């Protein structure tokens, strides 16, 4: 039986890798230069890959082999299970349904990437929206820009309604209850188990979040000269979705430190972080094929502005799509995105078959990027990389507060709360489209303690303004898991390898850290993720490390909030 499986998987891996490359090339073109021709190419390539991975004969043989899993090597079983998950994304038992989904996703991506936002009748780019919310303190102007950022929702909603039904239909072809259930199956979990895990994260971190929320609304009320609200108005926060609360802590605002830097310097410095740990330099093709900087003003080309890293051929062709500018946020983002690139490099080796050139689970990929982003914000590293002067005296509380606000704690309540629960309802409970915006804002209010500045009726679809809702659905819990995971890995590195406090440590040029990270990454998807985590850190997935990292901050917040009403109910 093992010999039969080996022969079968040799063919499957070869076909999968070849068609993955063709589809990725087409998707790259469609993302970096949004045109009808490139959209059509992406759609055609998607159909070709789906025809292979969802072939009924392939599905039958995969299932037949899995009936004998006890006779097969563990890595063989993992490949077969992954092949079946791939097949469930495009089962050719119903080719018309799969074709309709691919066509709908291509149209949705084109609408999303090609949308032009307007403010007072003039075009405004996503980067300009973000920069405005980061810097402007005029509340009426902020509200106008925030509302402009939601303009894409009504344009995207019809396509999203159609896609919800098509994705659920595709998932049900191979026996999954719905598309959300198919996605969480990649973790070996059910929808109920995944939602419970996310609820557990929020329950364990809620005392910290309530203190942070209370401190933040008082700070913002003072900034804007307004009464302290129960819930924070969304346009008070410097992020379109209130997922990260950035630029609140002046002592930790490093943007001025980047004024003499270039976007090229930011990416090269991120690469040097990894080479200092013992990783190789990025391949030359990374620099010649990536799309790293914003489209120049007046250029007619449109591109996807969401930062990402691509493994185009599951081999050596690694690229990144970014819009890097010289500021602290892009400094962090560049370190994060290259984390994906070095994950690709680490598991691209003969021992890891193409089907398993993935993270131990999807969150491991995000977690590795997030871990390096956390390390890139540590004061000792900022000094060693020349951003902060050697004599700089850090306000440790300010940096911890910024860590919590900008990168971690509100993000859990956005990702575990609003995003996960809304998509579980939309896909898992077939929530009627006439209730989508009401349910969205119910969750934003309940989980995040945030409310819109004006009435948001069903003529809007504010969830659809988030990229992932359209092109990476039923996935966002992975970012929450990644956030928890980054603190576990960071805690282990700081305490066990560096013998330094997790809140103030430096990975720079430490080959032990590099070996630890490579030991996780080079496995790809060849081992169960729970086993990988236990082997690396000695513990199961837990918010313990995250809670301990912010324990000094919690004590400070409790002191600051003494006498204030905590929470929003």
Model feature map: region roles:
Residues 45-48, 54, 188, 192, ...:
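Extended, well-ordered alpha-helical scaffold/bundle regions in very large, multi-domain proteins
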């Amino acid at each position: 039986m093992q010999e039969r499986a080996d022969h079968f998987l040799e063919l499957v891996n070869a076909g999968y890798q070849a068609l993955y490359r063709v589809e990725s090339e087409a998707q790259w073109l469609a993302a970096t230069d949004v045109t009808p021709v490139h959209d059509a190419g992406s759609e055609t390539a998607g159909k070709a890959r789906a025809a292979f991975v969802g072939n009924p004969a392939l599905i039958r043989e995969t299932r037949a082999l899995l009936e004998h899993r006890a006779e097969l090597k563990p890595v063989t079983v993992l490949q077969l299970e992954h092949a079946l998950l791939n097949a469930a994304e495009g089962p050719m038992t119903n080719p018309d349904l799969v074709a309709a989904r691919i066509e709908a996703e291509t149209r949705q991506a084109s609408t999303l990437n090609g949308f032009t936002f307007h403010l007072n009748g003039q075009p405004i780019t996503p980067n300009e929206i973000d920069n405005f919310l980061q810097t402007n303190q005029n509340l009426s102007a902020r509200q106008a820009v925030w509302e402009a950022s939601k303009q894409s929702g009504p344009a995207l909603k019809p396509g999203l309604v159609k896609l919800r039904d098509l994705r659920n239909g595709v998932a049900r072809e191979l026996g999954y209850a719905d598309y959300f259930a198919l996605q969480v199956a990649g973790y070996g979990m059910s929808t109920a188990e995944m939602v419970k895990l996310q609820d557990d994260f929020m329950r364990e971190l809620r005392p910290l979040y309530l203190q942070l929320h209370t401190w933040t609304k008082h700070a913002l009320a003072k900034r804007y000269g307004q009464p302290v609200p129960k819930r924070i108005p969304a346009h008070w926060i410097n992020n379109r979705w209130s997922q990260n609360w950035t630029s609140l802590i002046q002592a930790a605002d490093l943007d001025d430190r980047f004024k003499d830097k270039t976007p090229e310097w930011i990416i090269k410095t991120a690469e040097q972080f990894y080479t200092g740990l013992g990783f190789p330099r990025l391949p030359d093709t990374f620099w010649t094929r990536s799309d790293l900087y914003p489209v120049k003003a007046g250029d007619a080309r449109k591109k996807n502005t969401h930062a990402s890293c691509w493994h185009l051929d599951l081999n050596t062709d690694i690229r990144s799509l970014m819009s890097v500018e010289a500021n602290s946020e892009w400094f962090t983002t560049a370190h994060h995105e290259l984390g994906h690139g070095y994950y690709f490099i680490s598991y691209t080796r003969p021992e890891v078959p193409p089907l398993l050139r993935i993270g131990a689970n999807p969150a491991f990929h995000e977690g590795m990027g997030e871990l390096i982003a956390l390390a890139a914000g540590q004061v000792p590293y900022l000094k060693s990389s020349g951003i902060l002067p050697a004599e700089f005296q850090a306000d440790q509380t300010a940096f911890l507060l910024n860590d919590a606000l900008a990168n971690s704690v509100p993000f859990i309540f956005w990702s575990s709360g609003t995003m996960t629960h809304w998509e579980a309802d939309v896909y898992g409970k077939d929530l009627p489209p006439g209730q989508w915006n009401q349910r969205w804002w119910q969750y934003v209010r309940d989980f995040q303690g945030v409310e819109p500045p004006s009435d948001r009726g069903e003529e809007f679809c504010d969830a659809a303004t988030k990229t992932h809702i359209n092109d990476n659905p039923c996935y966002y819990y992975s970012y929450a898991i990644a956030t928890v995971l980054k603190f576990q890995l960071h805690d282990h590195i700081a305490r066990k390898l560096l013998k330094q406090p997790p809140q103030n440590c430096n990975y720079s040029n430490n080959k032990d850290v590099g070996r630890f990270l490579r030991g996780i990454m080079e496995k790809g998807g060849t081992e169960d993720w729970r086993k990988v985590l236990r082997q690396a850190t000695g513990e199961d997935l837990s918010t313990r490390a995250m809670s301990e990292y912010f324990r000094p901050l919690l004590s400070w917040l409790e002191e600051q909030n003494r006498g204030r009403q905590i929470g929003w109910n």
